[in-house]
Amino acid sequence: AEQESILASVTVDDLKINETSGVQYYKNLGMLHQAIQDSIKVSECYDETLFDLPAVILYLAWFGLTEEQIINFPKEDVLDDGVMINGEKTEMPFEILQIFKRLRDAEGYYQQARGVIFRAYVYSDNLIRTERNSKINVSKMQGLVNRLNTLMDGTYSLRYNVIHQSGIFYRAHLLECESTQFNLEDPEFASKVFCEDLSSKVKHTARIRDYKLYKQLFY
């Protein structure tokens, strides 16, 4: 219910945009969804389900999956009432879950060339597949995402790294609000919270600085 209300309440004005570099961070999943939908609307594409692939890639990035995990993500982990993320069922806002289910069940998409043609996906157990490949590599995945990002000239920074980091910071902030033992000065604790090795003092300091910027933007 909380996810649904977040999704319903987000407006374009909520997006924090730096004019020189686009969106630096996303506050929540609703904000990310809004940016993706805005981008797809300007595409004037004959079949908007063409963009289900990059959209799902970015939603999985938000939930903390690595690029390798995303390209190997199995269709069977998309359930009718949620998505299995790292072995746990995760509830999704209705609109986003519909995109996951649509991609899971899709046989391909329509494209307007000389007339309308149907591009069939190669059969695969993987959720992320194309008309040529039952499994794609990370470079191809980045290309799919970039196709979506360029629709609005990168204004929304729809890139894996931006969204992956935003999701981590969002969950870190939830934890900080709920926990009395939240101490980012401890490198081991910070490494667990930010899902990376922060034993290096330089990296540790930089990540805390980034997290503080995220909080200044949104809270």
Residue ranges and their predicted role:
Residues 32-44, 142-155:
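Short amphipathic alpha-helical segments and their helix-coil junctions
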Residues 86-131:
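Basic, alpha-helical nucleic-acid-contacting "clamp/cap" segments
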Residues 144-210, 214-219:
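Short, basic (Lys/Arg/His-rich) helix/loop patches that form interaction surfaces
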Residues 3-39:
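Flexible interdomain linker/hinge and immediately adjacent N-terminus
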Residues 29, 50-55, 138-142, 161-165, ...:
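Short, leucine-enriched amphipathic alpha-helices that occur as contiguous helical runs
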Residues 34-65:
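Basic, Lys/Arg- and aromatic-enriched nucleic-acid-binding interface segment
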Residues 56-82:
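Short, charged phosphate-coordinating catalytic segments
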Residues 18-25, 122-144:
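An acidic intrinsically disordered interaction segment
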